[in-house]
């Protein structure tokens, strides 16, 4: 079910937005940033019901290279300077206090879930990436995730 949603709905939509796919993860290079959209399948999924959740992340290859060495050819949400769950984007709450939500996909609701995911990416994830177009904006989002500024801004 999720494989069909990814193949038939998400992959074509993300390809049109210049994302490249590897497994359940998509990357798009945008200036100094790499945008990441990642889907995770739950281990407890069955053939009748699959459970998924999603993440968005923004990676900065130059930062990663300074700290860890060469950047990977493909980034995951764990490589990001920050990542947010789809649930956080959906609820417009990037504080880190939103509880995680797993989508339960069954044969009878797979088309509805596909539409929900496509809408979330188009109306939440892409505008989120667009809002993070400078290091100042990226720092604001990191501070949002950490609960506010504890030190003066680095980029100003």
Segments predicted by a language model, with ranges:
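Intrinsically disordered, low-complexity regulatory regions enriched in serine/threonine/proline
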Residues: 1-9, 21, 28-156
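Pyridoxal 5′-phosphate
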Residues: 14
